Amino acid sequence: MKRTLLLCSIVFAVQSHAQDQQIGIIDFFGLRNITVTRARVALGLQEGDTLPMSFSSIEQRLKDSLGMAEAHLNVVCCDDSGKLILFVGIQEAAAKHSMYRKSPNWNIFLPTDITDAYNSFFEAFQIAVSKGIVGDDISQGHSLMADSATRFWQERFLVFARHQSKILRTVLRNSADPEQRATAAYVIGYASDKRLVTDDLLLAAVDEDEVVRNNAARALAAIASLAQRKPGLHIKISPTPFINMLSSPVWTDRNKALMVLSILTTKRDRQLLLQLRDKEFRSLVEMARWKSKGHAFNAFLILGRVGGVPDRELKKVGWNLPRRNALIDKIVKANRRK
């Protein structure tokens, strides 16, 4: 079964659009005591190299040669020249406690009309990506793609979420099958009562399975955007799981955490910004310096808010690497004085 929008948008785009599978950018995250230079030597890859067929041996080499607890490689498409972007996630020491919820064990499944629709949506999205049609509208608290064929299936999800919410919520919380949970996480985001499913999605955001977490966080980002615009809906989304994800060695965790937190910090809640400064300042600085501008921007935006820089200034300099790094240096220096 096809599992997720995530795999489609990354893998299919890489296969279709990258120029000869050539690496254009390598960005690291999670480095604390190990230097980038040392990590690059252990990685054995550099910009301009062809993407290897498998990452498992490279991840193992990183762990063995550097004595790290975890190493994860993720590739996404593409930099400004159409080449691949390779993210190298590091966890130097083993985590004392898992941030993830242990997988449930119920033998329960979604109706086939839901899984069939999800698979059809996936296929339509693949075609849309191949044509470069990736825009979507999240103004209603869920994604509606610009591509009509993809949107057709998303509109079916609205019907499923309205009439089969009980089974969707039960599968999301209890199914032993991660593919079932991932499908439920995506479809349940189309519920008309976003407040009702927020807790279900927050639980899924700490699922043991990466794809379930990704789909849940993607849904919560759209809901968070709606909640910001319509406070009368009284939708509350805890930032805690997403703050914790900023330490994850898994790129999709960090990517979606930045997406959600860039929305939750829009109004610059003082307590949230203090939490981010006290717990994840270093992670934000590291990600804000990524050479991949589009992926660095949310980290830079959040870091700037932590540092008290107006959004208009952040958006003005965020796409210029030298100016971005200069402002990051200024924020870091100011933080040391606090």
Predicted regions, residues:
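Sec-dependent N-terminal signal peptides
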Residues: 4-13
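Sec/Tat signal peptide C-region and signal peptidase I cleavage site
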Residues: 14-18
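Periplasmic polypeptide-binding modules associated with outer-membrane biogenesis and secretion
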Residues: 19-32, 45-104
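Extracytoplasmic/secreted envelope proteins and their assembly/folding machinery
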Residues: 36, 40-43, 55-63, 165, ...
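Short, solvent-exposed interaction modules
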Residues: 259-261, 265
